[in-house]
Amino acid sequence: MKIAILGVENSHADAFGELIKLNPEEYGDIEIVGIYSEEEDAVKRITDKGYATYAASSPDEFLGKVDGVVVTARHGDNHYKYAMPYVKAGVPCFIDKPFCANVENAKELARTAEENGALLCGGSCLKFIDEIKPLARMAKTKKVKTGTVACPVNMNNIYGGFWFYSQHLIEILLTIYGKNVKSVTAFCPDNTKNRITVIFNFGEFDVCGFYTDSYRYTASLMTADNNIYQAYCDDVVYTFKNEFDEFVQMVKSGVMPCDYDDLVYPVKLLDAIERSYTQKKEIFIE
C-alpha cells in the first residue's frame, strides 16, 4: 500500500511516519512514497527522521502513484486544495481537522468524492479518546438533562484563526450527543484571547461548550435522574494510531467508516459558531 502525506507541518505527519517506521510487523506493507509541504522546515523535519525520502514540488505530483493520500496541512484551506485532485481521481483520502475551512468547500469536496467513488475519513482524532465513551453510552441509553464540553482553542495564528484548533470540541460533542444540533449561540468577548462560550441547542436539552487556552479536554453529562458523568483527558497522543488505523482499514477494505455528511457536519457547526459570535445572534443549523 503506497501513500503520500500532503502538508507535513503538524504532529500527525510525524506520528504516522513513526508508526510505520517502528512497527514493521503491523505496517510493513505500507510505504510513504513521498511528502509535500509549502514549509521547507517541515519537509526537512520529516526527511531527517527517515519517515520519507522524497519531497514533491507540487501537491498533485503523486496522482497515479499512490493507493491513498493523507492530508495533514496545518491550514484548513489547504485541505480542500490538496485533496481535490485526488478526490476527482477516486483516490482514498484521510483529511485532518478541520475537514475544510468553510462550508462550501466541505460540501463540494464531499460531493465530488461521492460522485467519483473516493473514500474519505479524518477530522479530529479526539472522537477516539477513551474517556468520553462512558458519556456517549449514557447519552444513548438515558434521557439527557444537560452537559458540557471544554477544549483548547487558538485564535491568534496564521493557520485560519478560530478554525485551526476548534474542531476538536465539536467532534467530542458529536461523539457524545450525536448530530442533532438545532442552533448555536456563541460569545467571544475578545477576539485576541482564547475564550469562546457556546450554547449548543439540541432541542430537549442544551450543552455548553467552553473554548479556553488550557490544553485539557473535559466533558460532563447530567441525566434526567440527576446523575452526573464526567470525563477528563490530557493525553491524546494515542488517538493518532486510531485515526491512522481507520484510514488504513478504509483503503484496504474499500469501506468508509462514516458517511460523507459526517465529515461536513462539523464544518457547518464551526461556521455557525463563528457567525454567531461575530454577528452576536443565534444561528440555526440547516
What are these language model-derived features?
Residues 191-244:
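C-terminal substrate-binding/catalytic lobe of Rossmann-fold NAD(P)-dependent oxidoreductases
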Residues 149-214, 261-264, 268:
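Rossmann-like dinucleotide-binding domain that binds NAD(P)(H)
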Residues 45-51, 61, 69-74, 250-286:
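C-terminal helix-rich "cap/oligomerization" subdomain common to oxidoreductases
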Residues 100-159:
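A contiguous active-site-proximal alpha/beta segment in oxidoreductase catalytic domains
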Residues 48-110:
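Beta-loop-alpha module in the N-terminal Rossmann-like domain of NAD(P)-dependent dehydrogenases
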Residues 13, 43, 79, 106, ...:
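A general structural signal for well-ordered alpha-helical segments in protein cores
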Residues 1-50, 141, 258:
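N-terminal Rossmann-like dinucleotide-binding module
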